[in-house]
Amino acid sequence: MNESGTLLQLIQENLDDFCDSRREDFSSISPDLVPVIDYTQSLLAGGKRFRALFCYWSWVGALSTAPVRQSEMERQASAAAMVGVSAALEMFHAAALVHDDLLDQSDTRRGAPAVHKRFEHLHSASGWAGSAERFGVAGSVLVGDLMLGWSSEIFGNALLAAPNTSIETSCRNEFSKMRVEVMAGQYLDVLEENSASTRSVDEAFGRANRVMLYKTAKYSIEAPLLIGAAFAGGEPGLLRGLSAFGIPLGMAFQLRDDILGVFGDPAVTGKPAGDDLREGKRTVLVALTLQGLTPSIGKIFEELLTSRELEPEQIAFMQQTITESGALAKTERMMEELADESLNALESLGIDSRAKENLKALALKVINREA
């Protein structure tokens, strides 16, 4: 097994051990809490682990630039701590997914029911009183909040092995900034879904870009890179270089996601075809589409986008409209340009070749993914 594969296995073991310990705590309180830990552990069992891998290889790269090399014992201790740091990022991401699916009213995640739907099904199957839907909402809010708290706990425990207090403080600052930025991005995303129809078409592109920057680019790629480098005591110049690599890559990552959200294969993505259209997502792809339509067609497209109840033929019409407007081709070009910008920035980083090669391989996976 290669180094990345070993890391992913160790992260899964870390998360499983953490959840098993919490299962004991919950069981001692009440057996009614078992579904909470079941749904949490199920969600943590899958995913691409991009954030963890970007964090780890950034740490490896930053270590190679350190003026004083670590001893083998110090490196092993730091590597063990990095597993915890990476696991915390994955716990945080899973929490964000729980809340994101609820906000988007998305019924599925990775081909299985979303957490709020699992709680809803539990309510219905148990024959309980009240609204199953409201129970699902309440359960998923609480599970997401719980996982956010657990991510901070795992992160804090990992930082106990930080080489010094300066590094510990830098890591905490980066983690805190990530939390603020992704929550801000989530709010702006919800805001756009509800307010975009009251704004001009000309405003849509800039506002969609802003959501993309904070909800995805900084959170998914830049923050893990900066946390990993900070844990290695990376210098400010290196962190700036990693941002120059991570932000355009994160933007390209989201543009790929936007395309998959409209044109992706459900068998691969685990979500229904055109799911972003049903959810009324105000993506860059949608903004470019509206810019390229006549007022009459634009009005029809806008009405469909805000309806939330779309038939398959309406999805097909919107997909065709997006393609014929030129928005799909423009989005793909943007993605390619951002990817080139990112890879050029990576090439200029003064880190060792092993870290650079692994970061490049990760970047290419992000850009070319099909799910």
Spans of features found by a protein language model:
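Residue-level signal for inorganic ion chemistry
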Residues: 54, 151, 185, 286, ...
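A glycine-biased, small/acidic residue-tolerant capping/turn segment at secondary-structure junctions
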Residues: 30-31, 256-269, 297-305, 314-316, ...
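Divalent-cation-assisted or electrostatically stabilized phosphate/pyrophosphate-binding catalytic cores
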Residues: 109-144, 196-217, 240-244, 266-292, ...
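Active-site alpha-helical segments that house and flank conserved acidic catalytic motifs
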Residues: 80-113, 173-184, 218, 222-229, ...
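C-terminal charged capping/lid subdomain of soluble metabolic enzymes
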Residues: 316-371
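Conserved N-terminal diphosphate/IPP-binding helix and adjacent helical/loop segment
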Residues: 1-89, 94, 98-133, 186-206, ...
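All-alpha helical catalytic cores of prenyl diphosphate-utilizing isoprenoid enzymes
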Residues: 25-30, 42-52, 141-150, 154-263
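C-terminal helix-coil-helix/basic helical segment that borders enzyme active sites and/or dimer interfaces
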Residues: 61-64, 73, 228-237, 260-268, ...
